[in-house]
Amino acid sequence: AFSQLNLSADLVWSGGYSPVEEPTEGPDGWWENNWTSGEAAKAGWDLWSTNEEAKAWSDKFSNVLVCGDDQIYRYEGYFQAPESSSLKNWSSFVAAEMSCQYNEGKSFTELKSNIKDFRAWLMENSTGEEFSFGAYIPTGEDSADFWWYNWHGDFEAMARGNANWEKNGKEMQAKFDDTATCT
């Protein structure tokens, strides 16, 4: 329903995340909007806050989702999954997220190198199922240096992908571990 509002051509994707386990603190879900730029995001939110159709949508779905502007986080996404294996259907998926801190002397430079190697690893070692990944780099205050996300079509695909990673990804995991500590 949200995507049907068609408020901005600069809004690339919107979707919600609902945790599998109830969180002990913080929000019980997250809404993500991907914009073409930071400027487009600001303009989009300015439009949203004054748009009657958007207000009507918010009121209609207030029993499902209420978003406050006190918890808006800004990131630059770095997405390099091979197109051939990327998740195609973003209407329903499962995700795993990790909060990451760079190890001493490491930075986005090493992370980009790891991602390039991981992309090549995926092209040779994937399960053949759709899979996407990304790094979200904070552009403001954040508890993490970056957030790592893995997206799978469903929990079964995630289990198969994780088993494949455990079996075949040890060398690649060591490269990631040298760059950052993720939890």
PLM features: residue spans?
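Short S/T/G/P-rich N-terminal loop/turn motif that feeds into the first structured element of a domain
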Residues: 1-183
